[in-house]
Structure formats: C-alpha cells, structure tokens
Amino acid sequence: MLRDVEHVPIPVEVSSDAGSSLADFLRSRGISRLLVLCDGNTYRAYGEALEADLERASLSRATVRLESPPVLATEERVVESFIGLSPEIEAVCSVGGGTVTDIGRFLAHRGKRPFISVPTAASVDGFYSIGAPLILKGVKRTVICRPPDALFADPAVLLQAPRSLSASGLGDLIGKITSWADWNLGALLWDEPYDPGISDRLRDIAIRSMKLAPRLSAPSQKDAADLLSLLIESGACMVDAGESRPASGADRKSVV
C-alpha cells in the first residue's frame, strides 16, 4: 500500500514493504552504513525488524537504543546518540515517535548526514519538519534543522501503537482549525507573513482529519496510514512556510 502524500517532495512510503523500500532507497543513494536510533519500545515495535531488513540487503548498521524511560530530548540523550555517530556512518535513521525523531533530526543535521524518518506511531506532525525541539539546560528550545530526506512507515506497526498516541495525532490535526484561524487573523490584523495556498492546504487537512476521526475508534491499517499521511502533509505546510506559524497557534497555549 503506497501512499502518495501531497506537497511532500521526498520519497514517502507507508506500506508493509517499508523496510525493504528503505533498503532500496539507501542503495540508490550509495549509502551502505546506517545509524539506527530508537528507544526500547520502538526497537521492539519495529527497530529489530528493520535491522533484519537491512541485514538481508547486506547493509551495515549501528544501533543506538535509548533506554531508561521516559526518553526526553535532553542534552544527555543527544550526547548518548552522538557517541554512535562514528566517521563511517553515512546516514541517520530514527525509528520511533516525536522525541526519537527530534534527536535523530538534530544528530543528522549537526553531523551533516542524510536523515531518514521511520515513524512507529501516527502521533505528531513533526515527522516531516525542520524543527527539533530539545530540552537544553531545562528549557525547551526548537533548533532549526532540515526535513528528512525520506520517510518510511509500516501501517501494521502504526496500528499496534498505543491508542493514546493516535489520539494525540488526531488532536494535533483537529487543532489546525484553531491555528488556521489564528494565522488568518494575524495576517488581517497585524500583517503577518501569509501564504493563501498553504492556508488552503491546512484548512483542507483539518477538514479531512475530522472526517477520519470516527474511523479511529476501531481503526484499520488504512486508517492508521491515512492519519500519518495527514500529519505529514501538515508538517509539509510548516516546511513550505519556513516556520511553524501556519500549524501552531493558540491550540498550543495553556491557560493557567
């Protein structure tokens, strides 16, 4: 099941053949040694199977498994990951959710390596993103990096993720209604930078997510793939805008 995700100019495949397709992508780029970054849960969910796919393709890999939950994007975790980035490593592949992806994105960016994102849950719109939120000296700070060079996911793995993670992804998408309205108001009232094409795409994503919502009470693999595709499209809106403003507004604020 190959998904064509609109407005995303990189290879994106959500299918049961994701692992072998990733191996084919690496060979097409002349990459023979990969760093696989995961945590304990995501290693069991898909990291181990991906290692087997890489081995069958005669590709070398080193694996950094971040243990001792919760895994947060702190300086300690970043340093732990960097230790695995030896000179012979030619690309970085994150296998996991938002935090593992953020660390992997930062690692690849600073290490000047290609970055491949392998989501194990349809939980956030940051899989296709330029920002890496890190916790530096106890304060969350978003470091601007670059989007992944490719994205692969297995819908069976997405479906097996905790239901709360899919709910998080759906909530992220429905919240785009608020961020879309905020962005339009900002353009009208304060002359904020604005792109009507991206605005239309974001509104369409929010509407499609609401239509998808009833199916997620008892989702199929296709439903999980559709949810991830919408999250990727939302991320593409931010990449094309060069900032998170289109998809991040008052829906991200807390009232105390």
What residues fall within each predicted segment?
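A short, small-residue-rich loop immediately preceding and capping a beta-strand
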Residues: L85-L107, G111-T120
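A glycine/threonine-rich phosphate-anchoring loop and its flanking beta-alpha core
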Residues: H109-R208
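Alpha-helix capping and helix-loop boundary segments enriched in small/acidic/polar residues
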Residues: S68-L72, V139-K140, A161, R245
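Active-site segments that bind and position negatively charged phosphate/pyrophosphate groups
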Residues: S199-V256
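Short beta-strand/turn micro-motifs composed of small residues
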Residues: L37-C38, G96, A153
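Residues that form or flank phosphate/diphosphate-binding pockets in enzymes
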Residues: A45-Y46, D102, A161
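Solvent-exposed alpha-helices and their adjacent loops that cap or buttress functional pockets
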Residues: D4-V5, R29, G84-P87, A108, ...
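ATP/NTP phosphate-donor binding region
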Residues: M1-A91
